[in-house]
Amino acid sequence: MTIQYDIEAQRQIGEIFKYGKKKFGILTALRFKEGIRKKISMLKDNPLTGSIEWELTDEEHEYRFLLVKPYKIIYSVKGDIIRIHLFWHTHRDPNILRNYPIGVCEDVAPYGKE
């Protein structure tokens, strides 16, 4: 299984890290980021481990999420590709998530490579 990140997800993880560094310090931000990476890496062995994200799933696309509080990691699985679409803060209004433009046709890149 290959994990790919949408451009939006790459941007968001950078913002999450910057915010965490400013608010909680570099060590806490690094630990949180590493926790996210480990959780995502577990998907390689069991890509369907995440719960279905019913706010986004429709007849054509199934989206799942992993919870790393306070974020949902929204992803999809197609063939042998696990695609990370976005990081959703759980305190945000879920109505916004329903209408959020998931990058179904957006360029993707492996995490850390642009």
Question: Where are the language model's segments positioned?
Answer:
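Generic beta-structure capping elements
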Residues: 6-8, 46, 87-90
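Structural signal for well-ordered, non-membrane alpha-helices
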Residues: 17, 37-44
